[in-house]
Design a protein with these regions (language model features):
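A short, conserved alpha-helix within the catalytic core of class I
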Residues: 138-149
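C-terminal alpha-helical "lid/dimerization" subdomain adjacent to the S-adenosyl-L-methionine
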Residues: 163-210
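Class I SAM-dependent methyltransferase SAM/SAH-binding core
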Residues: 60-62, 66-118
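Conserved Class I S-adenosyl-L-methionine
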Residues: 196, 200-231
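Conserved beta-strand signature within the Rossmann-like core of class I S-adenosyl-L-methionine
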Residues: 154-163
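Class I SAM-dependent methyltransferase Rossmann-like catalytic core
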Residues: 12, 17-43, 47-48
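A conserved beta-strand element that flanks and buttresses the S-adenosyl-L-methionine
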Residues: 130
Length: 231
């Protein structure tokens, strides 16, 4: 399946606040249904083992949307007795505002509105820099810039979790957006997100071009996911 380069998702344009909120909820439901958050959290937990237990664990979630994954990390850290600081970055001011409200009960989460390609964060400030369902929104040149910024602010791992561009994934996402009675934007954008996603070799090449040559890409066909990780 060829990548749908240049195709535009509705969520990347202006969206009324109520529709935006509904679509972000749909994304979190889809992540729960397909297990995307679990794959990412496993990487955070693995990275945490490399950080002394008495030291603050710092996580950056790039393109963090409504904050579902950030909250999941915070809940895990509380259960594990780990001190954690999570910075959620999203370029949409409306999305960031919704995330702040959704994360209000989590003082360990800070939300900022910024572009992935120009992160307003200092070099080497995070143990894990994570992006889920984000890279497929970007064309290759911008994706490389975003990965370069993620590498700059990471002192540990860079993790990218995105949809697999396969017919199985396309069918799973199409079915999920219908069976779970998702918003019209989600029914449009979900399958298109699959078609816009990068194949494993394409994703690995983006990492290498961004200065992250030691990248490992794992496929999870049943979950419709790819996870790329570099340290």
């Amino acid at each position: 399946m060829r990548r749908a380069a240049g195709a535009r998702e509705l969520l990347d344009g202006p969206v009324p606040p109520a529709d935006l909120a509904a679509t972000l909820r749909d994304i979190e439901r889809l992540d729960a249904w397909l297990g995307g958050h679990a794959l990412s959290l496993a990487r955070v937990r693995r990275a945490a083992r490399q950080v002394p237990a008495d030291r603050l664990l710092r996580v950056i979630d790039v393109g963090g949307g409504g904050g579902g994954f950030a909250r999941r990390v915070a809940r895990w850290a509380r259960r594990a007795g780990r001190r954690v600081e999570i910075v959620l970055v999203d370029r949409g001011a409306g999305t960031a505002a919704l995330a702040r409200r959704a994360c209000a009960a989590y003082p360990e989460i800070r939300v900022i509105s910024a572009d992935a390609a120009t992160l307003p964060l200092r070099r080497g400030c995070a143990d894990v820099v994570h992006a889920a369902l984000t890279l497929h929104h970007l064309e290759p040149e911008t994706a490389v810039a975003a990965l370069g910024e993620m590498a700059r602010v990471a002192r540990g791992r860079v993790v990218v979790n995105d949809l697999a561009r396969t017919r199985i994934a396309l069918g799973l996402v199409w079915m999920a957006t219908r069976l779970l009675a998702m918003h019209a934007i989600s029914r449009h954008d979900g399958p298109l997100s699959v078609r816009r996603s990068y194949a494993p070799q394409e994703l690995a090449e983006l990492f290498r071009t961004a200065g992250l040559p030691r990248v490992r890409v794992r496929r999870y066909p049943v979950l419709a996911r790819l996870v790329a990780e570099a340290a």
